[in-house]
Structures are given as structure tokens and as C-alpha cells.
Amino acid sequence: MGEKQLTKEEIKARKMEAKKEAEFNALVKERMQKLENLQEQGKDPFDVYKVERTHTSQQVKDNYDELEGKNVTVAGRLMSKRVHGKAGFSDIRDRYGKIQLYIKINDVGEEKLKEYKTFDIGDFVSITGTVFKTKTGEITLHILDFQLLSKSLKPLPEKFHGLKDPDLRYRQRYVDLIMNEDVKETFMKRTAIIKAIREFLDNRDFLEVETPILSPIAGGAAARPFITHHNALDIDMYLRIATELYLKRLIVGGFEKVYEIGKNFRNEGIDVRHNPEFTAIELYEAYADYNDMMEITENMVAYVCEKVNGTTKVMYEGTEIDFKPPWRRITMVDAVKEYAGVDFNEVKTDEEAREIAKSKELELKKELKDCTKGDILVALFEEFGEEKLMQPTFVCDYPKENSPLTKKKRGNDELTERFEGFVYGREICNAYSELNDPIVQKERFMQQLKERELGDDEAYMMDDDFINALEIGMPPTGGLGIGIDRLIMFLTDSSSIRDVILFPTMKPTK
């Protein structure tokens, strides 16, 4: 068979692409030639090691009254250049913003002006100049001297078109940060959010700790792990899927309030809410229960939101969300009754629950015959209730089958003292009254091993050392985990988790 004939539009698009590539290559060649010329003149910009700048762009603007008429030195990336004839304007950008530059032949001389004109957008320069305001009131530096610090050998995307392709933005985040100020703002806010979380917990006398990322057992969550091999020990090891079991060991050891902010790794799919490598916080408090964890969650999130946004209210994808405490509390049984129309208080057996699953045509994670009443309760909530929870809501009292590390509900042996927090129909946190009975914990792990044998590769592994720690004795404890990336999505109105992770996981290009 012959090759498929291209349409006129496809031919035109290919020609345009070829033209753009040729233009790009010509610009790269031109910049390489400029670098060679500089090197021949003994002005290699890559031989510059350090710059003594006196001010940032923002400091010049903030202190204009005292700096007017004085000389300062700034440094940054050249973002625009409008120099024609004997004078002109430019802009450079540093971490804090942009500042305008004005150059004139009378101040720098003909040779220096000629050199300045050879600079390209994207080059790094240092500028020494006098601070003044233009007739339009813009704070500007009147250039007296300059130095090329680094040569940009590839042109930046066009100013007005910018870097729009999301895939390319994620792969080349360094270019994305240069071209899109709002992206830089998102990541500045990310840093502020994590700082505020630490501040909140430190003020409550929590101790920040670090636990292993490599472990012989993947525990603390229902997830598929990444596996690696330790050559010296000749054993397979796992990248952690959660920090839970190590942090609880520290509660056993006498650290009564601990937290860890760090990376977890789960060998699962990638979508707008999931990245295989993600940041989470887990915290544990001795002598506390899941009610205390609700109080910490709602107050911490409200504190962080107000700290970085000035209010507990945010707009997320056009919906106003208010994180002000107290958040709504509803049991999973009541949520299923409200949103699925099924009263699980009346469901007595697994078989009755399976009949309900059939009638609702539920999608289940395992075969119907292997599903328990608790499995079906959770599936009904996920199918009918989860996406309805737009405002911050704690869904409480999960079935024990789905919560192997959790204490049973006081007064109900079928349920556990566990909650998950939901916002905009999405889970952002998970918390328990932690199970501290080593005998029951071992039984729960054994049940999870049976689940693994049935094909559930996300079921928990047996952790004998953790059982040993519980046998030494762990006090009643409340525990909480929050997905920091998802929280940041809400506080920055970001629709994809990739928009709040600097370098998200991407499929390699060929």
C-alpha cells in the first residue's frame, strides 16, 4: 500500500513547522557566532564567576525616594531591548520582578553602545546605572556600565505567544518560569504554604522528623510501590508509599507529637490529581483521637489559607470554597443514605449488600462474591457521594475492612474511627484514631495478606517489626495525612497537579 496522502492543511502545517525550525536554527547559529566573537575578543561571558550587585529590582523600586540620583548595580535576564540609533530602553528581570533600563551613547560611548546592541533577549547582564523616573513615571536605571554574564544560545519563545503547550511547559519548566510570571507566583506560593504548615505545627509543639525513603517493606497505605535493589545487601527494597509506620514507631519511642513533610512514591497512573512522586505531610499526636485530628486539620488549613491568601475563602475553578472552621461532619453511612438513597443501618449481611451493588450497577475493585458489606458501602460513597462534597467536609467512620491501621468505632465493631476530608469532590486528607493493639493489628495484617493472595497488589504487607513496636506499647494516638500538592492546587486555583509540581513525571520523548 502507498503512503497516505496529506491534506492541504497538513501540507501547509508541515511547511510552517519547517520554516519555524529553519528560523530557529538560524537564530541559534547567529548567537553561537556572537559567542565566538566575544571569546576571540577575550570577553567570554562564561569566564565571569561572581557579580557584586547592590540591589534587586524590587529594592530599587521600594527605596526609590532615597535612591533617586544615586548609582546602583542590578543583575538579571534581558527580557526586552528597544535600542535604535544613539539611545533606547530595555528591561531585565530578576527573581523579584522587572526593571527598565535606559542607555544613551553620551554616557557609555560608541563602542559600548555597539556592544550592548549585540546582546540578545535571554542573556544575563549586570547593570550599573543612576536611578531616575521617566516622564511616564516609570522607575528606570540610566546605564553607566554593564557586563555580559551569560550568553543565551537558544531564543526564548515569542513574547506574545509565550510558552503555551502544556506538555512542553512541564518538560521545560525553566522556560515556563521565565515566560509566565503567574507560574512563578504559584511556586512562590507553594513555598509559603509549606512554610506556614511548619509554622502552625511548630507553634503547637510538634517535632519535625525524617524517616527512611528506602524500606524493605512498603507500608502505611494501600498502594502499589516502586521496587529497587540494594546491591551491597542484595535485597529488594521499596520507595516509601507513606511515612506512617515509622512515625508511629517514634510515638512508641516517646516522641509525643511528630510530623514529616516529604516525598512519597506510588507506582500508579498519572492524571490531573495523581503524580507518582508527590509531597505529603503526616503527623501523629499521643493521647489524641480522630476528633482532635479534625480540629487540627480544619484549623491548620484555615491558618495556611489566611496566611498566604489573606482570607479563608478561595475561588477554585469558578466555585467559592470557604475553609473557615468548623467544617461539615458526616458519617459515611449517612452520606450514602443522603446521596445514594441506601440506608446501611438496615443492611445486615454481605449478601444483602451485594444485591444492592447489583441493583446500583456498581463498579467494584474485586469480584462481587469477594466483596463485603464494608467494601460495598465505600464503593457506594465513592460512586454517589464523593463528587457532591464541594465545601470542606469530613466523612467519618469507615468500615474496618478498608482501614487496617485504625481503631474500631466506639460502640460499633463494624466501623473504625477514621475520616477523610473532601473539598470540591476530592479527597485531601486521611486520619485515624490509630490502632495500638498489637494482637488486633496482626490479625488485620493477616487479613490484608489474604487480600493480596486474591490479587489485590495494593493490600498491606506484613510488618513484623511494627508489630514488635506495638508490643512494646504505644499510647492512644491520633494520626493525620494530607496531600500537600492537592492542597496547593486549591489555594492557587490550579486545575492539574502538574501545575503545582515543578518537575512532574513525564513520559520520555523519543
UniProtKB/Swiss-Prot annotation:
Origin species: Clostridium novyi (strain NT)
Keyword terms, alphabetized: Aminoacyl-tRNA synthetase, ATP-binding, Cytoplasm, Ligase, Magnesium, Metal-binding, Nucleotide-binding, Protein biosynthesis
Disulfide bridge positions per record: none
Highest taxon listed in the record's lineage: Bacteria
Any Gene Ontology CC annotation: cytosol
Single GO biological process annotation from the record: lysyl-tRNA aminoacylation
Uppermost EC category: ligase
Molecular function (Gene Ontology), one example: catalytic activity, acting on a protein
UniProt-annotated binding residues for Mg(2+) 1: E420, E427
UniProt cross-references to InterPro entries, sorted A to Z: Aa-tRNA-synt_II, aa-tRNA-synth_II, aa-tRNA-synth_II/BPL/LPL, Lys-tRNA-ligase_II, Lys-tRNA-ligase_II_bac/euk, Lys-tRNA-ligase_II_N, Lys-tRNA-synth_II_C, NA-bd_OB-fold
Entry's EC annotation: 6.1.1.6
Cofactor comment text: Binds 3 Mg(2+) ions per subunit.
Catalytic activity: tRNA(Lys) + L-lysine + ATP = L-lysyl-tRNA(Lys) + AMP + diphosphate
Cofactor(s) required for function per UniProt: Mg(2+)
Subcellular localization(s) per the UniProt record: Cytoplasm
Protein name as annotated: Lysine--tRNA ligase
Broad class of the protein's primary localization: cytoplasm
Family, per entry: Belongs to the class-II aminoacyl-tRNA synthetase family.
Residues engaged in binding Mg(2+) 2: E427
Assembly with partners or alone: Homodimer.
Record CDD domains: LysRS_core, LysRS_N
